[in-house]
C-alpha cells in the first residue's frame, strides 16, 4: 500500500486502480495531442530555415 501525501491513510485498491487509469489517460493524451503539436512546430522551424537559407537566383 502506498502512503498518500499529507496524511496517515494508505492508498486502497480502488485508489490505486484510479491512479493507474489516470496515468494511462495522460500517456494517451501525450500521444494524441502533445506529439503532433511538437511535430508541427518542428516542421515550421525546418521550413523557415529552408526558406531563409536557400540560394536566390537573380535574373540577369
UniProtKB/Swiss-Prot annotation:
Residues spanning the membrane: 32-52
Topological type in the membrane: Single-pass membrane protein
Subcellular location(s) per record: Membrane
Cellular component terms per the entry's GO annotation: membrane
InterPro entries referenced in this protein's UniProt entry, alphabetically: DUF4519 (IPR027960)
Pfam family, one: DUF4519
Biased composition (Basic and acidic residues): 8-21
Residue segments, region Disordered: 1-21
Broad class of the protein's primary localization: membrane
Segments forming a coiled coil: 10-33
Database matches in PANTHER family: SINGLE-PASS MEMBRANE AND COILED-COIL DOMAIN-CONTAINING PROTEIN 4 (PTHR34644:SF2)
Similarity comment: family membership: Belongs to the SMCO4 family.
Descriptive protein name: Single-pass membrane and coiled-coil domain-containing protein 4 homolog
Lineage per the UniProt record: Eukaryota, Metazoa, Ecdysozoa, Arthropoda, Hexapoda
